[in-house]
Amino acid sequence: MATLVDIEQLKRNIREIDSSSVYEETSLAEEESKAFKKILKLASIREQAGKKLHERLIKDGFSEQAVSNALGRAIDAHIVDDERYAEAFMRTQLAQGKGRRGVERALEQLYIDSPSEEAWQLAYEQFG
């Protein structure tokens, strides 16, 4: 009989593991969905840098995996676009009288490449 009890306990343990895995997957999917909605909300207000969004979502309590998945979806859908952010940031900074080096340094801290030379020329014509 001891063997039967052990087998039954093993079956219960397996069921618990299976059900907790399903819960974790569902929970991750729900968390990712909430993180994606937060990205949509923030991106609808103004352009967002991927790194800043990542930091904000982690600070707001989302898991690394949920943030990475949601941010990946937003980037794939062009909701978040670091190149577009860089150009908007550049124009804003130049309009405020800031110089090119300062803008480039700020973008480097966000791991964003500097806008193209053509974008700089257009911005200088408009604000410079």
Describe the predicted segments one by one.
Residues 1-128:
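An alpha-helical, amphipathic repeat domain used for nucleic-acid recognition
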